[in-house]
Amino acid sequence: DEETYVKLQSQFIKRTIKKRYVALLDGILEANDGIIDLPLRVDLDDRPRQLVCYEHGKPAQTKWEKIEVRNNQTLVYFYPITGRTHQLRVHASHELGLKTPIVGDDLYGSKANRLHLHAESLTFIHPVSKEELTITTAAEF
């Protein structure tokens, strides 16, 4: 119903919903965690690609942590603070970010059978019961 929709939408707008993504990166990260703060805007000459732009980009922040390294690839958690288009993909691949694209990212890295980025967990306040609710689903990689 409309009231439920508005209550859920409000949580997204206020950025109170907690999101956790898991990604497999094409390389080895030395650091264990951090925050990436790179403003993004659309690449007008190459849509839908996004690019880092300090002059005209919108703020984009991503918290991340390393889970494990295996077969010259790094499994990480991403916790987006903002929610820009392609934010996690650009923050992973960009030279000022992690410099390590997501496996299967044909826009910012190299092609594979799939993009190895998965929304693993979503936590929010139930609009009716007011209880904190977490929905999780494991990645298949």
Give, region by region, the residue ranges found by the protein language model.
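RNA pseudouridine synthases
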Residues: 1-141
